[in-house]
């Protein structure tokens, strides 16, 4: 292809001398797709523009937040006015209550919400609250579900449901890992066995509303309800991590879509309209344990800052408009169907999972229902596909195990452009496989 990436290559070489790995979040380095990253100069609507002048249809959307599109005029106008009033006060503002009201309106399971600065802060704080509220220490998480980089959540399972957790990163102490039990996702029977053995010690289950960091893997019918029943039976809390799915798959997130009421909910991404933000909330009797109302400490210098609150308010007000989610779902269904047909035409096996406007095409010929089945994907083939799509002006998540996100800014022309690019990219994959 005729695209050039010289300036991106220069900037990445420089960045590696200044920043670990040249990036401030590991996935951005493009390591798993066999090339160096492109450096972005600006974004508008459905598009990214890199420093070499290349334009891309963007399906990363800053890893989910940009659901209304980049530099949306209403969001940008409100932010410019907010900047002129000062960027941070370290004091309460009406904006915090306005955003809180919008969130509580969308999530009936929440009576109160606390703003923080990231999804990691939200999940970390929710776990501390769950432990403080229940007086228990252990938590259960699920294979393939990602909840940020807090120590107790960077854990993988050993061989067997109740094997002591093993850290997946150096620097996570064993005594912290020992309090995290990892279970297979979408497997209610194994979860029941875990609770039968350790239920009296479990403070909480934390689960993604729609897992997106092993690729998109929907919960099986009745699975979330089964998890909810187990936690109630044993007096543990159910924490639903909706950092990715909140306001994405439905205005009320996955819990509204699937009809489940958790004790605590974690949010992020979309509620900041592209600015750093997080939140956690739940029933008043639990949330009133958070300081200064209660004894469980949590704080943040920039929590509830006026810029993130402003962007979040405008974004959620846009999303509340009639027909928003029907339009997103229609676009995503059209794209998923077109991509599936393109893969079939090229003879490349791809299994597509989609929930609302988030989807993943797994390079495998079997259904993907959990982490183990996601891992049957041909990651080398995905890398070939990713590079071919990038060269054709389509910016995808640079990992097989991530979601593609659609935005309201995308047009049918953008989707058709993407499908046409995919038809060529799948042919490249097929040709590479034929050589092997």
UniProtKB/Swiss-Prot annotation:
Cellular localisation: Cytoplasm
Q: Which InterPro entries match?
A: 4pyrrol_synth_GluAld_NH2Trfase, Aminotrans_3, Aminotrans_3_PPA_site, PyrdxlP-dep_Trfase, PyrdxlP-dep_Trfase_major, PyrdxlP-dep_Trfase_small
The residues forming the signal peptide are none
An annotated GO BP:
chlorophyll biosynthetic process
Chief location of this protein within or outside the cell? cytoplasm
Residue runs in coiled coils:
none
Instruction: Give the EC class as a word.
Output: isomerase
Task: List N6-(pyridoxal phosphate)lysine occurrences by residue.
Answer: 269
Task: Give the Gene Ontology MF terms in alphabetical order.
Answer: glutamate-1-semialdehyde 2,1-aminomutase activity; pyridoxal phosphate binding; transaminase activity
Gene Ontology CC terms: cytoplasm
- Please name the pathway: Porphyrin-containing compound metabolism; protoporphyrin-IX biosynthesis; 5-aminolevulinate from L-glutamyl-tRNA(Glu): step 2/2; Porphyrin-containing compound metabolism; chlorophyll biosynthesis
Known catalytic reactions? (S)-4-amino-5-oxopentanoate = 5-aminolevulinate
What PROSITE patterns does its record include?
AA_TRANSFER_CLASS_3 (PS00600)
Instruction: Name the Enzyme Commission number(s) assigned to this protein.
Output: 5.4.3.8
Matching entries from SUPFAM superfamilies are given as: PLP-dependent transferases
Q: Which cofactor does it need?
A: pyridoxal 5'-phosphate
Print the keywords alphabetically.
Chlorophyll biosynthesis, Cytoplasm, Isomerase, Porphyrin biosynthesis, Pyridoxal phosphate
**Whom does it interact with, and what assembly results?**
Homodimer.
Fetch the HAMAP family from UniProt.
HemL_aminotrans_3
The similarity annotation says: Belongs to the class-III pyridoxal-phosphate-dependent aminotransferase family. HemL subfamily.
Q: What is this protein called?
A: Glutamate-1-semialdehyde 2,1-aminomutase
State the species of origin.
Answer: Heliobacterium modesticaldum (strain ATCC 51547 / Ice1)
């Amino acid at each position: 292809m005729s695209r050039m990436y010289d300036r991106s290559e220069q900037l990445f070489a420089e960045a590696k001398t200044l920043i670990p790995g040249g990036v401030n979040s590991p996935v951005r380095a493009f390591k798993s797709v066999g090339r160096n990253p492109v450096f972005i100069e600006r974004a508008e609507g459905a598009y990214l523009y890199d420093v070499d002048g290349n334009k891309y249809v963007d399906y990363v959307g800053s890893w989910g937040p940009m659901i209304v599109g980049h530099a949306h005029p209403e969001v940008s106008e409100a932010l410019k006015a907010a900047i002129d009033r000062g960027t941070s006060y370290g004091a309460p503002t009406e904006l915090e209550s306005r955003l809180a009201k919008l969130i509580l309106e969308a999530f009936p399971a929440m009576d109160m919400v606390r703003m923080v600065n990231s999804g990691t802060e939200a999940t970390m704080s929710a776990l501390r609250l769950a432990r403080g509220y229940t007086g228990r220490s252990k938590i259960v998480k699920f294979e393939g579900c990602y909840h940020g980089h807090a120590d107790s959540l960077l854990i993988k399972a050993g061989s067997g449901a109740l094997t002591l957790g093993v850290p997946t990163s150096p620097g996570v102490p064993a005594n912290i890992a020992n309090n995290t039990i990892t279970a297979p996702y979408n497997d209610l029977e194994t979860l029941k066995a875990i609770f039968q053995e350790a239920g009296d010690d479990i403070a909480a289950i934390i689960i993604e509303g729609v897992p997106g960091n092993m690729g998109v893997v929907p919960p099986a019918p009745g699975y979330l309800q089964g998890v909810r029943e187990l936690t109630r039976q044993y007096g543990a809390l159910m924490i639903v991590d909706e950092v990715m799915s909140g306001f994405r798959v439905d205005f009320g997130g996955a819990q509204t879509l699937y009809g489940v009421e958790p004790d605590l909910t974690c949010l992020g991404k979309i509620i900041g309209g592209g600015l750093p933000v997080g939140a956690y909330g739940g029933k008043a009797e639990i949330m009133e344990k958070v300081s200064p109302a209660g004894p469980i400490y949590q704080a943040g210098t920039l929590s509830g800052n006026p810029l993130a609150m402003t962007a979040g308010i405008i974004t959620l007000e846009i999303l509340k408009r009639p027909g928003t989610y029907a339009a997103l779902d229609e676009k995503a269904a059209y794209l998923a169907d077109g991509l599936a047909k393109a893969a079939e035409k090229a003879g490349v096996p791809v299994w597509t999972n989609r929930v609302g406007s988030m989807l993943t095409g797994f390079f495998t010929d079997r259904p993907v229902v959990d982490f183990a089945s996601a891992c049957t994907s041909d990651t080398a083939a995905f890398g070939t596909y990713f590079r071919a799509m990038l060269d054709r002006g389509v910016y995808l998540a640079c990992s097989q195990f991530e979601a593609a996100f659609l935005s309201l800014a995308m047009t049918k022309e953008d989707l058709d452009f993407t499908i046409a690019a995919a038809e060529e990219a799948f042919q490249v994959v097929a040709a590479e496989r034929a050589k092997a």
